[in-house]
Amino acid sequence: DIFARVAPAQKLKIVQSLQRQGHVVAMTGDGVNDAPALKQADIGVAMGITGTDVSKESAEMVLLDDNFASIERAIEEGRTVFNNLKKTIVIILPTNGGECLTLVAALLLGGLLPILPLHILWINLVTTVALAITLAFDPVEQDIMRQPPRDPQAPLIDRGLVWRIVYVSGLISLGTFGLFFYELELGSSLEAARAVAVNAIVFFEVAYVFNSRYLNDSVLNRRGILGNRIVWWGIAAVVIFQVVFTYWPVMNSLFHVAPLDAWMWLRVLGVSLMLMLLVEFEKAIARRFALRSQATPRLRTNSEV
C-alpha cells in the first residue's frame, strides 16, 4: 500500500497498525510533529541535515546525508555485524563445551586425562581467540538483504544454534577421546598422546571455522573456503603457534607434551576433515527440514477467515 501526503498523526496510526499485524516498522521524519511516530516505530529514522533536534532525539537512526539509500546500506551493515557476532559465539562455545565434556568424561570414567588444565588455557587464550576474531571480519553474505527482518524478541542464539553447539561439542569430545586412546593403544607415550589431543582440538576448531562462516548454507564452495582472507591469516597464525607448541623443547617441558610424527599429524587432520563434513551434513538436514516446514500449508483459523 502507498500512503501519500499523510499528516504526522496519520503516520503514528500507520506505524501502530502495521505493528499490530506483526511487522517490523521503520519510519522516517524530519519535523517536530514526526517525533511520536519515530518513537513508536521499531526503527525511527531522522534527517541529519534538515531534521529538527526533537526528531533526531526521538529516532534510533540519523541520516547524516539525508540520503534514503543510506538506510539500505545501514541495514546491510547492521545485519552483517549481528551475523558475525553470532558466528563468533558459535565458534567459541563448542570448543569450550568439547573441552568440558572431555574432562568430565575422563573424570567419570576414572581414566587418564587427555588434556590438562594448562592445555585448556593454551587453547582458549591463544588459538581460539586467533580463530574467533577472524569471523568478526567476515564479508557480507550474498543473500543477506533477501532475508526477512529479525524478530526483536528472538534470542541471540536460537534453538537450532543451541543444538549445533551441543552437537559440535560432542564431536570434539569424541574425536579428542578417540585419538588420545588410539595413540596410547599404538604404544605412544602419554606426552605424545596428549600432544595429539591438544592439536586435535585446535584443528577441529580450524575446520569448524569454515563451517561457521555460513550458519545455514553450505560452505563447500569457492566462496565459502576462500571468501575471507583474514580467516586464512588466522589459520596461518594458529599453525605457527601449534608448531612451536609441539616441537619447541621449552614448550614440551612446560606443557608436558612430546613432538608428533607425520602419521600422528595425518590422523589429526583426517579426523578434523571428518568433523567438518559431519557439521555440513547436519546443516544440510536442517535446511531440508526448514524447507519442508515452509512448504507445509498452514490451516486458517476462524478468526482469520
Segment roles from a protein language model:
Residues D1-N33, K39-I43, L85, L107-G110, ...:
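Cytosolic catalytic headpiece
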Residues N221-R229:
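Cytoplasmic-side transmembrane-helix entry/capping segments in multi-pass membrane proteins
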Residues I123-T127, A200-Y208, V238-F245, V271-V279:
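Alpha-helical transmembrane segments of multi-pass membrane proteins
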Residues L116, R164-I165, V231, M264-V268:
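Residue-level signature of transmembrane alpha-helical entry/exit and packing/kink sites
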Residues D1-M27, A41, A46-D217:
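Membrane-embedded transport module
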Residues G175-L179, A237-S253:
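Hydrophobic alpha-helical transmembrane segments in multi-pass integral membrane proteins
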Residues R229-A237:
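Small-residue-rich segments of transmembrane alpha-helices in multi-pass membrane proteins
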Residues E141-P148, S218-R222, I285-R300:
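Short, Lys/Arg-enriched, Gly/Pro-containing loop segments at transmembrane-helix junctions
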